Amino acid sequence: MATRRNPTKESITTSPPPDQQPRQPGELEHREAIQLRDLPGYPQQVLWKLIIYSIAVLVLPLSAYFYSVNYVFDGNTTYAGATAAITANLILFSYIVVAMREDKGDQEQLREQQQLRGNKEETKKMK
């Protein structure tokens, strides 16, 4: 059985809610800038790859199963299931390889940018 709370014993806060508290000038803009900077931005290319591979993981193994059970193995579902499993694993492996290549490309671009910044700083020091 649930116990009843006595509301008089509970502590009551007297501070106004955060949205009604007085703000300093510029505080709101600073918070908005932080929130916008912290939003995750995913490149459209990455999202399209994810969508395409998701559809491929659903469609290709099922297609491989039904094609192989009807036309290749003449009703043997064991081999057809193995074919579907191999197809799904190949798609997953190819997605991992593509993701690793993309990540290496991003790391190389970051190194190049750092080198360019270093070269610019050196030229500024020389002047």
From Swiss-Prot:
The segments annotated as topological domain Cytoplasmic are: 1-45, 101-127
Under the heading InterPro entries, the entry gives:
Vma21
Its annotated compartments are: Endoplasmic reticulum membrane; Endoplasmic reticulum-Golgi intermediate compartment membrane; Cytoplasmic vesicle, COPII-coated vesicle membrane
Keyword Transmembrane helix (UniProt): yes
Query: Which one Pfam family would you cite for this protein?
Result: VMA21
- Recorded topology in the membrane: Multi-pass membrane protein
The keyword Endoplasmic reticulum is annotated on this UniProt entry: yes
Basic and acidic residues bias spans: 118-127
Residue ranges of region Disordered? 1-28, 107-127
- Motif Prevents secretion from ER positions after renumbering to this chain: 124-127
The GO cellular component terms are:
endoplasmic reticulum membrane; endoplasmic reticulum-Golgi intermediate compartment membrane; ER to Golgi transport vesicle membrane
One of this protein's GO BP terms?
Answer: vacuolar proton-transporting V-type ATPase complex assembly
Where does the sequence pass through the membrane? 46-66, 80-100
Query: Topology: which residues are Lumenal?
Result: 67-79
Which keywords annotate this record?
Answer: Cytoplasmic vesicle, Endoplasmic reticulum, Membrane, Transmembrane, Transmembrane helix
Family as reported in the entry's similarity comment? Belongs to the VMA21 family.
What the protein does comes down to: Required for the assembly of the V0 complex of the vacuolar ATPase (V-ATPase) in the endoplasmic reticulum.
Protein name (record) = Vacuolar ATPase assembly integral membrane protein VMA21
| Lineage, opening ranks | Eukaryota, Fungi, Dikarya, Ascomycota, Pezizomycotina
